């Protein structure tokens, strides 16, 4: 749930920054000064270190008709490390959008590793004809391949030598202890003797 809130907050911050950038840049990508323009506000890719990738993409276009010089907002790409979540909800305040969720799970591609699985979910929210918000969440799992068990002869011989060394030190130590202690004979009392 916290991931959903962070994704929505990040999307809102990027939209505000994109609108501020539009107010400062006097020309658009074609260099024209007026007319109808589509504006791309943000493109967010969220990548996790555990080989699971989540992508949240928001393509928001709006129509501008004015005599002032409109500008195209810069395409922004941000990489953030997050924990994976299964549900993403984004709501537009003041507008009740029609939501069309789709989900797909595909088998591994030829370009992907043979054991990877790619799962994606997409949600399109058309609120007005000039506003389109798309949220895509996809997770790719790449299983880690272990090196496997490999016999190392050096470690085997080293372990045997180490064990024999420790045993020999213990044996020599015990021999020295008993030799220094000396032999203690006990005299047999007459009541201990068996006659």
From Swiss-Prot:
It is found in: Membrane. The modification Phosphoserine is found at residue 187. Keywords: Glycoprotein, Membrane, Phosphoprotein, Receptor, Signal, Transmembrane, Transmembrane helix. Residues 174-195 are cytoplasmic. Residues 24-152 are extracellular. One of its GO terms (cellular component) is membrane. Residues 1-23 form the signal peptide. Its main location: membrane. Residues 101-126 have a biased composition (Polar residues). It holds the Pfam family MGC-24. Belongs to the CD164 family. This is Porimin. It comes from Mus musculus (Mouse).
């Amino acid at each position: 749930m916290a991931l959903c809130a962070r994704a929505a907050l990040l999307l809102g911050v990027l939209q505000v920054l994109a609108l501020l950038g539009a107010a400062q840049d006097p020309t658009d990508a074609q260099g024209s000064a007026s007319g109808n323009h589509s504006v791309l506000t943000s493109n967010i890719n969220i990548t996790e270190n555990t080989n699971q990738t989540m992508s949240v993409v928001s393509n928001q276009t709006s129509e501008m008709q004015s005599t002032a010089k409109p500008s195209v907002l810069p395409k922004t790409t941000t990489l953030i490390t997050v924990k994976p979540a299964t549900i993403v909800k984004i709501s537009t305040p003041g507008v009740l959008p029609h939501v069309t969720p789709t989900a797909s799970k595909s088998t591994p591609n030829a370009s992907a590793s043979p054991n990877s699985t790619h799962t994606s979910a997409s949600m399109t929210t058309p609120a007005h004809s000039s506003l389109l918000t798309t949220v895509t969440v996809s997770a790719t799992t790449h299983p880690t391949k272990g090196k496997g068990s490999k016999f190392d002869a050096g470690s085997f011989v080293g372990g045997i030598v180490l064990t024999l060394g420790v045993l020999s030190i213990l044996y020599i130590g015990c021999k020295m202890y008993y030799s220094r202690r000396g032999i203690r004979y006990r005299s047999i009392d007459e009541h201990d003797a068996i006659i």
